[in-house]
Amino acid sequence: MLKPLENRVVLRVKEEEEKSMGGIVLTSASQEKPQTAEVVAVGEGKTNHHGTLISPLVKVGDTVIFEKFAGTTVKMDGEEFLILKDSDLLAIVE
């Protein structure tokens, strides 16, 4: 499994089958990039200029919304993950 460093998080992007308004299944080329994902790993956090550790606000299992073009995609064990900084997260879905 991936263990993120500092203030990074590892996400499993939730792929959803996209359909047009008329019910036609869209190809992956015509779909919007998903912005919702499940947090699968969280780094320790990052220290500020005073030396205080600032922990990420998310935890494993959270569903989050993230910046559209943020992060780096990584494939591991046949699965695709997204690694990004916690500052690229926009919201936690409750």
From Swiss-Prot:
Gene Ontology CC:
cytoplasm
Q: A Pfam family in this protein?
A: Cpn10
Gene3D superfamilies the UniProt entry points to: GroES chaperonin
InterPro entries per the record?
Chaperonin_GroES, Chaperonin_GroES_sf, Chaprnonin_Cpn10_CS, GroES-like_sf
Gene Ontology molecular function: ATP binding; metal ion binding; protein folding chaperone; protein-folding chaperone binding; unfolded protein binding
Keyword tags = Chaperone, Cytoplasm
Q: Kindly list the biological process annotations in GO that this record carries.
A: chaperone cofactor-dependent protein refolding
Q: Where in the cell is it found?
A: Cytoplasm
Signal peptide from the UniProt entry: none
PROSITE patterns reported for this sequence: CHAPERONINS_CPN10 (PS00681)
Q: How does it assemble?
A: Heptamer of 7 subunits arranged in a ring. Interacts with the chaperonin GroEL.
> What HAMAP family does the database record attribute to this sequence?
CH10
State the NCBIfam families in the record: PRK00364.2-2, PRK00364.2-4, PRK00364.2-5
Function of this protein?
Answer: Together with the chaperonin GroEL, plays an essential role in assisting protein folding. The GroEL-GroES system forms a nano-cage that allows encapsulation of the non-native substrate proteins and provides a physical environment optimized to promote and accelerate protein folding. GroES binds to the apical surface of the GroEL ring, thereby capping the opening of the GroEL channel.
Name of the protein: Co-chaperonin GroES
